[in-house]
Design a protein with these regions (language model features):
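Contiguous, well-ordered alpha-helical segments that form the cores/surfaces of helical PPI scaffolds
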Residues: 72-77, 87-88, 99-109
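Alpha-solenoid HEAT/Armadillo-like helical repeat scaffolds in large eukaryotic proteins
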Residues: 85-93, 104, 116-125, 129-133, ...
Length: 274
């Protein structure tokens, strides 16, 4: 993975605009609520790239970040914006300005502000805000267990991720936070959705395999017979993560009836654990 500098992601014109905003705020901090919202209009909303990079301790996928998001982070970092100033931007910002602030969090030091804004996002159903806060980077994983973002808080946010159907793969390393209580919560949500005839978050099977609770293994076994290819793949990955050997025969029985190469490969690994 490439390592790069945050400022290098901006072209000269955008960087000049960011530096102008930094100078203005440095002269009069009261200009921050004016300079910050103007960034999308002044530097644009184009995507910053298509690669996954490492920037100052953060692991991010540039495909999820816009030029204005990076410019905002440059300004907030250079001006040492306080938590109070950032919360004021949140309180008075529109939907897009809040996205920009949440994207900036990926490049700011993890701290109480991160946790407070995670809480704001968790209490809403705004998909773009959830994606901006925890998607396309490792911010969730870097925050877990710090500054009051304990297991219970992390579980609630991951449950919101499941509720809004954001793919787990967009939260880099979030699978490491799997725990039995989260599995119980995800299974309860899955049961509710199934009863209502609604689709279940596919990553449910991946996470419950890492930290099974009562009912997890039955759900995983049912998953490898599911009609949805994505569910079967996730269930096979979950069974592998569970590390159990007693399901080798069941995997071997399923193998001849599985047509998808990626799922077959996982079933072969499972069946070899006899």
């Amino acid at each position: 993975m490439a390592t790069t500098d945050l400022r290098s992601l901006l072209d000269p014109a955008s960087l000049a605009i960011a530096d102008q905003a930094i100078a203005e705020v440095g002269t009069d901090r009261r200009t921050l609520p004016v300079a910050f919202p103007s960034l999308p209009r002044r530097v644009g909303r184009e995507r910053c790239g298509t690669t996954r990079v490492h920037i100052d301790g953060a692991d991010v996928d540039l495909a999820g970040f816009r030029t204005c998001d990076v410019a905002a982070a440059v300004v907030l970092r250079a001006t040492a914006a306080t938590d109070a100033e950032c919360l004021d931007l949140w309180s008075h910002g529109d939907l897009d300005e809040r996205v920009m602030l949440l994207r900036s969090l990926h490049f700011l030091p993890v701290g109480p502000l991160t946790v407070q804004l995670f809480g704001e996002v968790q209490r809403t159903n705004v998909v773009s805000h959830l994606e901006a806060a925890v998607g396309d980077g490792d911010l969730f994983a870097r925050t877990a267990g710090r500054f009051g973002f304990d297991q219970a808080a992390a579980n609630r946010l991951l449950l919101k991720v499941a509720f809004l159907d954001v793919p787990l793969a967009r939260l880099f390393h979030a699978e490491r936070t799997a725990n039995a209580e989260l599995s119980r919560m995800l299974q309860d949500l899955a049961t509710e959705r199934e009863a209502a005839g609604r689709p279940v978050w596919r990553d449910t099977w991946r996470l419950i395999g890492r930290a099974p609770c009562p009912g997890s293994l039955a759900r995983l076994l049912g998953g490898i017979e599911h009609g949805d290819d994505g569910v079967r793949l996730a269930a096979a990955e979950g069974l592998l993560a569970a590390g159990r050997t007693e399901f080798a025969a069941l995997a071997a029985e399923r193998l001849p009836r599985e047509s998808r190469p990626a799922i077959r490969a996982l079933l072969q690994q499972l069946s070899a654990r006899r």
